């Protein structure tokens, strides 16, 4: 049935998609492509609604029940949802928004899906999204659309696990798509919404909404990183104009702040990766070339890896050589085994590592170069690879705004040997896995300055706050405020 679509959209629909049926409407269920333009999933939904001669609308929801749900993630997602609601309205596309909370926990999506001719969604090959996909597919035809990678996710039928082989396979696809403008599909009918009590986010008090959700209120919002298309475009435009040309030179020094810091906007789809790639291709500098390689090769390799390895959160996904060498070196005596709490609070006593964790704790992000040091430190600091992987995923997904992304899994698994090759000679703790020692990395930049920057308040302006009251609640409130700076 994807033959009803133009080629540039058909290639983005998962193969063997089920045929639409008789139904009242087409639903675009958006999750990680929360933008109103340059959105292949939205365009597929609009095109199919025209073909089926039924209305189309966008369904967007925020659950309390995903792992690591917190004030930080909820706030960022709601800020993005507010922009999306506004932008869809401006384009004449109907939309509804549901925030799961005590007042309303009904399964609205399943109720709407049962009435739909077709449900279209943007695919991300990680949990819990894959589980949710299966639940919807059980009651309605579901088309999963790649709205996140320049080279369509379905173009690679077999797994590729090294950057050079993935780059070689993907380059022809990138080259024919890189500079092509994206032409949005226009709605064929007036805005439509079903009988649904939608939340109007333009008038909503977002902090009050978040406070009413049954989520982790101990992970505070990052006030200097607002979610949404406007904020994402602003951050990208600033980097494009001021930082892209020097990216190749400055990107490895976290003190110089030579990176784009757009990963959270790409993760939630507030910013179009096609726009970013197109801008880079037109820049024609060494920095743009290097940035494009990171955006396409490494980011899309991680998506490809997660698609072909649904067990990407388990140690068994590591290559056999990596599992074996790490297991053999479990016998190496560990001089330091910090507790989870020491790690989470950034209280290991190692200045560089603690500053990295402070970056996650207070700012919801971690510079990519020190992220590798942060991740590999847990090989000698934990009992085995299984524990290291579990703790790294937890620390990253709990605090990072771009957590739970295929890129997060790719980067963390790389620390343990995935997407890499064996190294010789073997070293203590790491065996044949590429080693990276915090003490050695600390010699390469000004760690004291990095520490100072990571301890800046997340609000931008320091606040003096007194927490009055004792007990567990008072202690938790004080710690949350301290984490946020």
Residue ranges and their predicted role:
Residues 462-485:
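N-terminal Rossmann-like FAD-binding beta1-loop-alpha1 element of flavoenzymes
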Residues 21-22, 152-154, 159-317, 449-450:
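Glycine/tryptophan-enriched, flexible segments
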Residues 111-115, 235, 462:
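Alpha-helix C-terminal capping/helix-to-coil transition sites in glycosyltransferase folds
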Residues 184, 444-457:
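Long, compositionally biased intrinsically disordered regions
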Residues 15-19, 455-463:
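A short, basic/flexible loop-to-alpha-helix module at the beginning of a structural domain
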Residues 253-446:
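Active-site-proximal binding-pocket segments
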Residues 30-34, 99, 123-125, 146-149, ...:
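Short, flexible loop/turn elements at secondary-structure junctions
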Residues 1-181, 185-186, 287, 358, ...:
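Trp/Phe/Arg-rich N-terminal binding region typifying the photolyase-homology
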């Amino acid at each position: 049935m994807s033959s009803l679509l133009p080629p540039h959209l058909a290639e983005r629909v998962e193969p063997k998609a089920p045929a639409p049926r008789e139904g009242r409407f087409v639903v675009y269920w958006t999750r990680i492509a929360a933008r109103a333009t340059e959105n292949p999933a939205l365009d597929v939904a609009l095109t199919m609604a025209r073909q089926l001669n039924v209305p189309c609308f966008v369904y967007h929801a925020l659950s309390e029940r995903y792992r690591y749900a917190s004030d930080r993630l909820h706030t960022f997602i709601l800020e993005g949802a507010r922009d999306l609601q506004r932008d869809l309205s401006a384009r004449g596309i109907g939309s509804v928004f549901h925030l799961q909370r005590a007042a309303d926990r009904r399964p609205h999506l399943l109720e709407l899906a049962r009435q739909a001719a077709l449900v279209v969604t943007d695919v991300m090959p990680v949990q819990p999204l894959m589980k949710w996909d299966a639940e919807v597919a059980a009651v309605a035809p579901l088309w999963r659309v790649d709205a996140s990678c320049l080279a369509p996710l379905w173009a690679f039928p077999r797994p590729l696990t090294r950057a050079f082989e993935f780059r070689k396979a993907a380059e022809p696809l990138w080259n024919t798509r890189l500079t092509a403008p994206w032409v949005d599909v226009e709605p064929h009918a007036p805005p439509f919404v079903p009988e649904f009590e939608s939340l109007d986010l333009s008038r909503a008090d977002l902090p009050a909404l978040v406070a009413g959700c049954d989520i982790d209120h101990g992970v505070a919002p990052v006030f200097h990183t607002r979610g949404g298309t406007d904020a994402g475009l602003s951050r990208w435009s600033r980097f494009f104009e001021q930082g892209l040309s020097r990216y190749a030179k400055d990107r490895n020094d976290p003190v110089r702040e030579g990176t784009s810091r757009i990963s959270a906007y790409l993760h939630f789809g507030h910013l179009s990766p096609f726009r970013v790639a197109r801008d880079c291709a037109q820049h024609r500098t060494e920095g743009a070339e290097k940035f494009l390689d990171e955006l396409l090769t490494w980011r899309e390799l991680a998506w490809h890896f997660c698609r072909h390895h649904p067990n990407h959160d388990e140690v068994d996904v590591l290559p056999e050589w990596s599992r074996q060498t790490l297991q053999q070196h479990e016998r190496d005596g560990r001089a330091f085994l910090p507790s989870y709490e020491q790690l989470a609070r950034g209280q290991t006593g190692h200045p560089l590592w603690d500053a990295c964790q402070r970056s996650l704790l207070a700012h919801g992000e971690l510079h990519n170069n020190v992220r590798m040091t942060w991740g590999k430190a847990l090989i000698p600091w934990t009992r085995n690879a299984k524990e290291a992987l579990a703790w790294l995923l937890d620390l990253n997904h709990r605090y990072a705004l771009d957590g739970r992304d295929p890129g997060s899994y790719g980067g963390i698994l790389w620390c343990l040997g995935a997407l890499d090759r064996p190294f010789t000679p073997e070293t203590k703790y790491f065996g044949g896995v590429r080693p990276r020692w915090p003490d050695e990395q600390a010699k390469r930049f000004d760690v004291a300055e990095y520490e100072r920057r990571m301890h800046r308040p997340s609000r931008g302006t320091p606040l003096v706050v007194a927490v009055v009251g004792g007990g567990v609640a008072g202690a938790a409130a004080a710690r949350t405020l301290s984490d946020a700076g």
